[in-house]
Amino acid sequence: MAKRGPKTVGVSYRLGLTPGVFMESLVKVADNSGATLAKVIGVPHYKAVWRRIPGAAVGDIVIVSIRAGKPELRKQVMRAIVIRQRRPYRRPDGSWIAFEDNAVVIITPEGEPKGTEIRGPLAKEAAERWPKLSAMASIIV
């Protein structure tokens, strides 16, 4: 039977953005942490029907495996935040936005960004959800 009452405690309402980064996607690492290319290997807290491929949208956390970069970072499994996606998504004002690439920023297990700067633009949705990322970004779109 369906649950009644308020939604789960601790989960803020989030507009349903179109997922653009899925399992096995190769994404660019857009910070100066030392990694350059990563592969998405998981989406935490994703619940779906059987055999559906998990996906993440701008501002979501994903689990990535570092594929290219500094030798000490390669083959490491880390958490990251999606900051750009190629798949177009609609904003509440009616405009559609899409970026040139799929990009992530590596974060520590505590949720702090590992790098100190973000290369390229940062989506407004990710900046509103993660204030520390907006402080690192030079361009917010």
UniProtKB/Swiss-Prot annotation:
Origin: domain of life: Archaea
Keywords on record: Ribonucleoprotein, Ribosomal protein, RNA-binding, rRNA-binding
Gene3D superfamilies in the cross-refs: Ribosomal protein L14
Molecular function via GO: large ribosomal subunit rRNA binding; structural constituent of ribosome
InterPro entries with a match to the protein in the record: Ribosomal_uL14, Ribosomal_uL14_arc, Ribosomal_uL14_CS, Ribosomal_uL14_sf
The keyword Iron appears for this protein: no
Pfam families: Ribosomal_L14 (PF00238)
GO biological-process terms attached to the record: translation
GO CC terms: cytosolic large ribosomal subunit
CDD domains in alphabetical order: Ribosomal_uL14
Function: Binds to 23S rRNA. Forms part of two intersubunit bridges in the 70S ribosome.
PANTHER family: 50S/60S RIBOSOMAL PROTEIN L14/L23 (PTHR11761), LARGE RIBOSOMAL SUBUNIT PROTEIN UL14 (PTHR11761:SF8)
Family statement drawn from the similarity comment of this UniProt entry: Belongs to the universal ribosomal protein uL14 family.
Quaternary data: Part of the 50S ribosomal subunit. Forms a cluster with proteins L3 and L24e, part of which may contact the 16S rRNA in 2 intersubunit bridges.
Protein name: Large ribosomal subunit protein uL14
